[in-house]
Amino acid sequence: MSKTTKQFQTEVKQLLDLVIHSLYSNRDIFLRELISNSSDAIDKIRFEAHSNEELLEGNSDWKIKLIPDKDAGTLTILDNGIGMTMAEVEENIGTIARSGTKAFMQALKDKSATDNPELIGQFGVGFYASFMVADRVILETRKGGTASDGCRWESIGDGSYTIEECSLDRRGTEIVLHLKDEFKEYLEEWKIRSIVKKYSDYIQYPVVMDITRTETPKGVDGEEIEGAGTIEKTVEETLNSMKAIWARPKSEVTEEEYQEFYKHISHDFENPFNTIHFSAEGISEFKALIYLPAKKPFDLFMADRKKGLQLYVKRVFITDRCEELLPDYLRFVKGVVDSSDLPLNVSREILQEDVQIKRIQKSLVGKILSTLAEVKEKNFDEYVNFWKEFGPVLKEGLHFDYANKEKLQELALFESTATEAGSFTSLKEYVERMPEAQQEIYFITGDSRATLKISPHLEAFKAKGYEVLFLTDPVDEWVVQALTEYKEKKLKAVDRGDVDLDSEEEKKEKETKQEEARKEYGDLISFIKSHLEDRVKDARLSKRLTDSACCLVADEYGINANMERILKAMNQPVPDSKRVLELNPDHPIMKIMTEIFRENKEDARLTDYADLLYDQALLTEGSPIKDPLRFTRLVSELMVKAATK
């Protein structure tokens, strides 16, 4: 195949432009990214060689070599990893088939992002960091097991690249960076050493470089030979310690080392919220270095998001995405697990069924949850910041992880009628504040605190001094299906079913008044129910309203307005369900409508008012009305009539 010139995908062109012109505060990370890519490539061939040893081609002296050439002005990164085919080169470099590309470019456009070039690794496009320091990049690669069918790729970062076949004896990848004049310092030994030490010291493969030293010859006694002159000697030196950070005692690892390793495996640019480093012995033996991030990633709720911990078996890399090590509600957790018990030829099927994996998962989950409980106890403000980022994900565990339900419900935080905006309460604190007469834990679900705070469903609870939890995350609708009780107190939705807040004594006092209201408004309510029969399941007098005229209430186990909105937003089918229209017997509109009804049951105002009440109930719960034009016309007519009386 002759040399072919191709255009980058549109997104890559935009990305290259941003990388070249916007990132400037820490260009050192280009080398970290390329070394990390080489390390990943060696990981992959070691793993694949378990089932196909021929891929090694007799070359298993793993290393990543850095070759600075001051005369040519080039820095070369060479590895003997898995390599790539021509198709893989085009797929991995010529295009970006990743949903996060636009989010990455938007982040770069933000002013703050120009000071955080580490973002480039976070979004999985680390190779392009080369163009921060180079005006020409050449890549030559051959995949293991493909004879001499190599590939040469070249670009000057102008939106196009050339690609052609080439003959390569060696397996792996070589990247040659033609450095811009202002970045020739990256050819200096001291500069390369400092970058490798800072960012790649823990890479488990040797990062090597030829070092030339001037020496005076020594005699057999080890002393320099007088008058012998000097000679130049070149040796290949290893620049990194290669000691797996998770295998070292905690006392020997500095905070800076923990933080740099986290950034290496996560491509995050912030320090982690918490670091968990421990060893497990007994039935299942493993070492783990686990990180809880400080900020949620942009793709946390994307279905195709890559997740899972890195898995090693006796220091041998197995996979960087072992999803079986943690449940899905902990998918934001980063880290490494190194097991002593799993077989080296472990397969995906084995991972899904292996009893050791299940034991490791149980231990990891327990350690993570206990760590969070400790932070919550000792530094609540810090924990609140973490909860704001990851609370919606952690709450998924209340629905799916029955074994850890009690631990998770102690970690859960909620806003409520008793907290300020942005402040939270736990279920334990809620129960401790409950008045003696209160029997249940009350909550309401919706899309925001602002909407829920003015909900008419809260009126009776406010009057009684009963606190109501605000559940504003979409996942909460599923959470409350599982979290039905806490400390023998049942959880009750204030917008579902009937409410019974009165004591027996209060019920007796109100019974006469309620009976009178039923007699006075019974016929009117029957009329309203009949008129709205295609929209409501029933109409009845309310025990929960004190100020508002009406509200809509779902059945005890029915679909409420918030669940309807969520299902529609997810393009899921919404079951046919009508709610109950509750009417406030103490509201003046009830007396007005009753007087009209007694005078003339055919009065058009009755149907207009019934429609207005229903639409009003929809609006107060945040639901759309079906005929906004008619609604506004009726309201306008009422305003005119009121003004001309």
From Swiss-Prot:
One Pfam family hit: HSP90
Annotated GO CC locations: cytoplasm
Region of interest (B), ranges: 349-565
Renumbered residue ranges of the record's region A: 1-348
Subcellular location: Cytoplasm
SUPFAM superfamilies assigned: ATPase domain of HSP90 chaperone/DNA topoisomerase II/histidine kinase, HSP90 C-terminal domain, Ribosomal protein S5 domain 2-like
Domain of life per record: Bacteria
Region (C): 566-645
Keywords for this protein: ATP-binding, Chaperone, Cytoplasm, Nucleotide-binding, Stress response
Molecular-function GO terms, alphabetical: ATP binding; ATP hydrolysis activity; ATP-dependent protein folding chaperone; unfolded protein binding
Entries under Gene3D superfamilies matching the protein: 3.30.230.80, 3.40.50.11260, Heat shock protein 90, C-terminal domain, Histidine kinase-like ATPase, C-terminal domain
Principal localisation: cytoplasm
Subunit structure: Homodimer.
Database matches in HAMAP family: HSP90 (MF_00505)
Family per record: Belongs to the heat shock protein 90 family.
Function: Molecular chaperone. Has ATPase activity.
Name of the protein in question: Chaperone protein HtpG
Source organism per UniProt: Pelobacter propionicus (strain DSM 2379 / NBRC 103807 / OttBd1)
Gene from which the chain derives: htpG
